[in-house]
Amino acid sequence: MFVKTGDKVKVIAGKDKGKEGTVLSVNVKKNRVVVKGVNKIKKHQKPSQTNANGGVVESEGSIHASNVKVISKKEDK
């Protein structure tokens, strides 16, 4: 896949078109990537022992790899 974790990318299609961020994770089998600050989804959490209050948790969802363009590669040491 042309995108690796840590690369800086720009979204070229979809509702978040024009936004930039770094790649947090890559799913090669499904050809999807998770970009920091892009495609925010809200998940309703039920109260549990670890999270007593519950509530709404916001996190990044995945987007298809064809909808992003690499701006700069992660520098390898």
Swiss-Prot record:
SMART domains: KOW. Keywords: Ribonucleoprotein, Ribosomal protein, RNA-binding, rRNA-binding. Residues 42-61 are annotated as: Disordered. GO terms for molecular function: rRNA binding; structural constituent of ribosome. One of its GO terms (cellular component) is ribosome. CDD domains: KOW_RPL26. GO terms for biological process: translation. Belongs to the universal ribosomal protein uL24 family. Part of the 50S ribosomal subunit. NCBIfam families: rplX_bact (TIGR01079). One of two assembly initiator proteins, it binds directly to the 5'-end of the 23S rRNA, where it nucleates assembly of the 50S subunit. One of the proteins that surrounds the polypeptide exit tunnel on the outside of the subunit. This is Large ribosomal subunit protein uL24. It comes from Lactobacillus acidophilus (strain ATCC 700396 / NCK56 / N2 / NCFM).
